[in-house]
Amino acid sequence: MARSMTSLVAVVPAAGVGSRMKADRPKQYLQIHGKTILEHTIERLLSHPAITQVVVAVSEDDPYYSDLAIAQHPDIIRVAGGKERADSVLSALCFLSQQPQKTDWVLVHDAARPCVAHQDIDALIERCSSHETGGILATPVRDTMKRANAQQMIDHTVDRNALWHALTPQMFKAEVLTDALSDALAQGVAITDEASALEWRGALPALVQGCSSNIKVTQPEDLALAEFYLSREKDRK
């Protein structure tokens, strides 16, 4: 890790409701192997030697988080999440900016990506240490891509050669990301991930190829796939 990265903190926006899962609770609180997805995700981040702290943004009326064992961990800090992802990330960044120890870089990671590999985090840190903007984990698009018309029929085939699936973590300098998110929200810009805020300001974040196993649990069938990946890792240990 480059010397300029004196402090690396992970930010986990976890205030979403995950309605597409059609479950009785937000998807981050569904269980795999006796632990919630959120616990798997945060423990994966905090076990990386470069990450000193995790700040998790949770809804103020969340009834689940306080019952988790990680809620009492000294290196896991809860802050109030917002209505949108960008609001939650900005809340965590504002908290960090008020601390006596400066946070140079942040890794923003989806609460529902419990399978991120340490080797991918290593690659992201290595690439961003020499990049002026920062970057994201991503995977190249492999399927043939079609653009639909208003009637949900194929309009044309899209060239996939320059297309990537954006993953997380996404890693940026804390001050730069704070300014970008604040400005974008003030202007009413739709922010779907942290990189899009930097793109809006004209920056060019790096793409760092990651593992396809770094899935986001969004649909019911994703839960079984995440369980498979985590079981495979457990068997290898």
Swiss-Prot record:
Pathway: Isoprenoid biosynthesis; isopentenyl diphosphate biosynthesis via DXP pathway; isopentenyl diphosphate from 1-deoxy-D-xylulose 5-phosphate: step 2/6
Domain of life, source organism: Bacteria
GO biological process terms, semicolon-separated: isopentenyl diphosphate biosynthetic process, methylerythritol 4-phosphate pathway
Molecular function GO labels: 2-C-methyl-D-erythritol 4-phosphate cytidylyltransferase activity
Site-annotated residues for Positions MEP for the nucleophilic attack: R160, K216
UniProt site (Transition state stabilizer): R20, K27
This enzyme's EC code(s): 2.7.7.60
Keywords: Isoprene biosynthesis, Nucleotidyltransferase, Transferase
Reactions that this protein is recorded to catalyse: 2-C-methyl-D-erythritol 4-phosphate + CTP + H(+) = 4-CDP-2-C-methyl-D-erythritol + diphosphate
This protein's record includes keyword Cytoplasm: no
NCBIfam families found in the cross-reference section: ispD
Family in the record: Belongs to the IspD/TarI cytidylyltransferase family. IspD subfamily.
Function according to Swiss-Prot or TrEMBL: Catalyzes the formation of 4-diphosphocytidyl-2-C-methyl-D-erythritol from CTP and 2-C-methyl-D-erythritol 4-phosphate (MEP).
Protein name: 2-C-methyl-D-erythritol 4-phosphate cytidylyltransferase
Natural source organism: Vibrio vulnificus (strain YJ016)
Name of the gene this protein is made from: ispD
